[in-house]
A protein has these predicted regions:
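N-terminal Rossmann-like NAD(P)+-binding domain of SDR-like oxidoreductases, especially those catalyzing
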Residues: 1-182
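Amphipathic terminal alpha-helices
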Residues: 6-7, 297-298, 310-322
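Hydrophobic "lid"/C-terminal helical patch
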Residues: 21, 232-236, 260-263, 315-322
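Residue-level signal for the nucleotide or nucleotide-sugar donor/cofactor binding architecture
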Residues: 41, 63, 92, 100-103, ...
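A short C-terminal helix-loop "cap" of Rossmann-like NAD(P)-dependent dehydrogenase/epimerase domains
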Residues: 53, 138-145, 173, 200-212, ...
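Glycine/proline-rich active-site loop of Rossmann-fold NAD(P)-dependent oxidoreductases
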Residues: 132, 159, 174-175, 184-198, ...
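C-terminal "lid/loop" region of Rossmann-like NAD(P)-dependent oxidoreductases
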Residues: 215, 245-246, 257-260, 268-291
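Conserved C-terminal active-site "lid" loop/helix of NAD(P)H-dependent oxidoreductases
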Residues: 225, 258, 279-306, 310-313
Length: 322
């Protein structure tokens, strides 16, 4: 497939979420170009479709891609998923995280705006910061922690991506949609960068201790990756979504200690739960969010869809692939 064939461009398309999105787009009959530097993604994530005649993989950074202008100009739509992610990476490599999430997004938005290509920009629930609201909606005020704690650099970088995207929408009429993803999980997610569910499942399958950081009372809502993909596709196909921000997440809430116990029970594991102080797991002064539950009424209103795959089913499907 040549670069000027009409296609959907997916940055980060060899990553966890991106690879599932690519499979869905191909199944829908779309031609797809993946632009990925494979820093966190991998060719293996695309092994099921690597020989597909409507798929092309371009390896490299967005900012270093000599074909970027052509790839964007001939695109029918762009999904910008490329980013530096994961708590471990954020804490250990803050410069890399900030540079990647800010610069690569700006380059992509410039190209998309020049050609007026409908674009979805993936943000994160991390932008809600330290707010203690029981559930977060898109219009809420955001409370970010201090810059001395590198964890908040990731949230700020993604929030700046949102500001950039909306600025391009306002000044250059870019048809853009921002999505705040809440703990997307499922097959192909790796625990290498601190992702909790694959880490728990891998340990439970070996009957090893499940290490819970802090007191385990922090709660999260876990969204199955195919539910996230369904929401992304529906938003891209909805002109009413453009210029807006949407939460994408499941509303079934569980503490991390509860998640560990649920994994043990679902897999019939002999593992035990082991609590580890944040200072031992990360750096002294590490901050965390106590709750992170989305309000998805806006998503449901615009797309007539809300993620509903149960946590038990998510654990089962994910465990089959680890």
């Amino acid at each position: 497939m040549s670069g000027n064939t009409p296609h959907i461009l997916v940055t980060g398309g060899a990553g966890f979420i991106g690879s599932h999105l690519v499979e869905r787009l191909l199944a829908d009959g779309k031609s797809v170009v993946v632009l990925d530097d494979l820093s966190t993604g991998s060719r293996d994530n695309l092994r099921g479709v690597k020989a597909h005649p409507k798929l092309r993989l371009v390896e490299g950074k967005i900012s270093a891609c000599s074909e970027l202008e052509e790839l964007v100009a001939s695109a029918e739509g762009v999904f910008h998923l490329a980013a530096a992610v994961g708590v471990d990476l954020v804490v250990k490599s803050p410069i890399h995280v900030l540079e990647t999430n800010l610069h690569e997004t700006e380059v992509l938005l410039q190209a998309a705006a020049q050609h007026g290509v409908p674009t979805i920009v993936a943000s994160t629930s991390e932008v809600y910061g330290k707010s203690e609201k029981p559930a977060f909606s898109e219009a809420d005020d955001l409370l970010i922690g201090p810059p001395q704690h590198s964890r908040w650099g990731y949230a700020c970088s993604k929030l700046m991506d949102e500001f950039l995207a909306l600025a391009y929408a306002q000044e250059r009429q870019l048809p853009v949609v921002i999505v705040r993803l809440f703990n997307t999980v499922g097959p192909r997610q790796t625990g290498r960068y601190g992702m909790v569910l694959p880490r728990f499942i891998a340990a439970a399958k070996q009957n090893e201790p499940l290490r819970v950081f802090g007191d385990g009372g922090q709660s999260r809502c876990f969204c199955y990756v195919l539910d996230t993909v369904e929401a992304l596709v529906r938003l891209q196909n909805s002109p009413a979504a453009r210029g807006q921000i949407f939460n994408i997440g499941n509303t079934e809430e569980i503490t991390i200690a509860g998640l560990a116990q649920c994994v043990i029970e679902q897999l019939g594991s002999k593992s035990v739960v082991e609590f580890v102080p944040y200072a031992e797991a990360y750096a002294p002064g590490f901050d965390d969010m106590r709750r992170r539950k989305p309000v998805v009424a806006k998503l449901e209103r615009v797309t007539e869809f809300r993620p509903q795959t149960s946590l038990a089913e998510i654990i089962r499907r994910t465990a089959e692939n680890i």
